[in-house]
Amino acid sequence: MSVMRTGIIAKKLGMTRLFREDGTHVPVTVLHMDDVRVVAARTKERDGYAAVQLGFGHAKTKNVTKPMKGHFAAAKVEPANRLVEFRVADDAVLEAGQVLSAAHFTVGQKVDVAGISKGKGFAGGMKRWNFRGLEASHGVSISHRSLGSTGNRQDPGKTFKNKKMAGHLGGERITTLNLEVAAIDEARNLIMIKGAVPGAKDGYVLVRDAVKTARPADAAYPAALKA
């Protein structure tokens, strides 16, 4: 059995906590799958690679362009608010119109979650890269939070590309690995992930099987679909 099955797209609702039977509690992030359905399938014979295109939510018809209206009409599905594509194995390609369930993942399973991190604006080296900063006294004037040397002297006499310096922080795609699925609410299409996931509230995240941990044997393959 191949390990490459589709992931899912979900909206981050926020954080809460779950209580266990022994009285302890665990912080969780609640993710909502809003009618996640297959919009298109990619096959090696036709497209050169195998993948599944998923749609999330529902878009207003007036906001959908004519080319995209034709794309959704060909799949016989309603226009989606978001589209995302996952590479899959040849035997894990799904048919257009199929709807994924929150039971796609199992409790205790490890997953990787990708999202757009919160934008922090322009940040200095200490906040952006955890630099130590300079001395608080002992001859240091006005440069307590500065970077220090960036280009040496005559040799090399320049600042190398990708040097860690002050600049824009956040607002980029971040993937957190090996997060644990704490609970599943299949009736309400909710997935609860232990701990924090990247991004702000109401942001979109991609959840897939962990690449560094084996998929549970009882996980649905190629996907958990709604009847």
From Swiss-Prot:
The UniProt record lists the keyword ATP-binding: no
Keywords in alphabetical order: Methylation, Ribonucleoprotein, Ribosomal protein, RNA-binding, rRNA-binding
N5-methylglutamine, modified sites: Q154
Record-level GO BP terms: translation
Gene Ontology CC entries for this record: cytosolic large ribosomal subunit
UniProt-listed InterPro entries: Ribosomal_uL3, Ribosomal_uL3_bac/org-type, Ribosomal_uL3_CS, Transl_B-barrel_sf
Any GO MF annotation of the entry: structural constituent of ribosome
Family annotation (Gene3D superfamilies): 3.30.160.810, Translation factors
Post-translational modification: Methylated by PrmB.
SUPFAM superfamilies according to UniProt: Translation proteins
Quaternary assembly: Part of the 50S ribosomal subunit. Forms a cluster with proteins L14 and L19.
Family recorded in the similarity comment: Belongs to the universal ribosomal protein uL3 family.
PANTHER family xref list: 50S RIBOSOMAL PROTEIN L3 (PTHR11229), LARGE RIBOSOMAL SUBUNIT PROTEIN UL3C (PTHR11229:SF16)
Entry function: One of the primary rRNA binding proteins, it binds directly near the 3'-end of the 23S rRNA, where it nucleates assembly of the 50S subunit.
Protein name, UniProt field: Large ribosomal subunit protein uL3
Organism of origin: Acidiphilium cryptum (strain JF-5)
Record gene name: rplC
